[in-house]
A protein has these predicted regions:
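Internal hydrophobic scaffold segments of catalytic domains
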Residues: 1-12, 65-68, 252-254
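N-terminal, Lys/Arg- and Ser/Thr-rich interaction peptides
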Residues: 2-44
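Generic secondary-structure transition motif, activating predominantly at the C-termini of alpha-helices
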Residues: 14-17, 32, 89, 142-145, ...
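Short linear sequence motifs
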Residues: 15-16, 20-22, 28, 69, ...
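A broad, structure-centric signal for solvent-exposed, well-ordered loop/edge residues
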Residues: 17, 25, 79, 126-128, ...
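Proteins with a high burden of low-complexity, intrinsically disordered sequence enriched in S/T/G/P/A and R
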Residues: 19-25, 43-48, 54-57, 188, ...
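Cell-envelope/glycan interface and biosynthesis
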Residues: 29-142
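Catalytic cores and adjacent binding grooves of peptidoglycan-active enzymes
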Residues: 103-259
């Protein structure tokens, strides 16, 4: 496994192309990491690349093809970043709940892979400002994309969208109407819901891209058994940095322009 132990390796990881329009670097920025001085870097980069690629190719690309540019609010979280956020009430679930979700490079308790991102779809923001509901896009995704879970929030129509090798197919929301919109076993789970999203753009399939040639990607990708993965490191985070202080480039690589 290629451990990220130099800045040059971090740059190489950021250049890995996950899909036609997304690169690994798009998902590494974290406000928690930047403000509190915590490294948001995968401990198992090959696994993070694989699950991130599945998320992008199966979910994010078709969304962007159909509705236009999407905005990534939160993507990958290292175990350290996620644990800090959970312990300090920064809207992060526990590490155990986020393995196979925001923590892309560690599988869930059943050893299954997954990846999640929190996104904003500007098209949905405009739609809701005109009186539409987030539920319309939720049903559109349910009918068209192989998502595992969706969780909508009250601001900007933002939502978590997750890919998983064993999809749950469940939609929840903190925004009104709150609660579970659908899950397996509910009477509204099957069939078409086209009447819920009348007037939506026609579905456009996702574009494809050639796989990135990177030292972090084996061909074919082979993962170490779950039993051989080292336990996530969760070192105490540094104290908050005051506004105006520059953060180290290794913490927030997005600040540095590179080719």
């Amino acid at each position: 496994m290629n451990i990220l132990n130099t800045y040059e390796k971090l740059e190489e990881l950021g250049r890995v192309r996950l899909s036609k329009n997304f690169f690994m670097r798009d998902f590494l920025y974290s406000e928690i990491a930047a403000w509190h001085g915590i490294r948001n870097i995968p401990e198992n980069p090959e696994r993070a690349i694989h699950t991130g690629r599945m998320l992008c190719e199966n979910l994010l690309e078709p969304l962007q093809s159909t509705f236009g540019r999407i905005h990534i609010r939160s993507g990958y979280r290292s175990p350290q970043v996620n644990e800090y956020g959970n312990h300090h009430n920064l809207n992060c679930a526990s590490n155990e709940k986020n393995f196979g979700r925001h923590i892309w490079d560690y599988p869930d308790a059943q050893g299954r892979c997954g990846a999640m991102a929190c996104i904003v779809v500007p098209w949905l923001v405009d739609y809701m400002e005109k009186g539409g509901s987030w539920t319309a896009l939720a049903w559109w995704i349910h009918d068209h994309l192989p998502y595992s879970s969706l969780h909508f929030f009250s601001k900007l129509g933002a939502f978590n969208i997750g890919w998983h090798e064993q999809p749950e197919r469940r939609i929840d929301s903190f925004a009104a109407p709150k609660g579970c919109l659908t899950q397996r076993g509910m009477s509204n789970h099957g069939g078409s819901h086209a009447d819920q999203y009348k007037g939506f753009p026609a579905f456009l399939s996702a574009p494809t891209a050639e796989p990135s040639q990177s030292v972090y990607v084996a061909s074919p990708v082979k993962f170490a058994p779950v039993s051989e993965l080292s336990a996530p490191t969760t070192k105490p985070a540094a104290s908050p940095s005051p506004i105006g202080v520059s953060f180290p480039l290794a913490v927030a690589p997005q600040v540095r322009a590179s080719n």
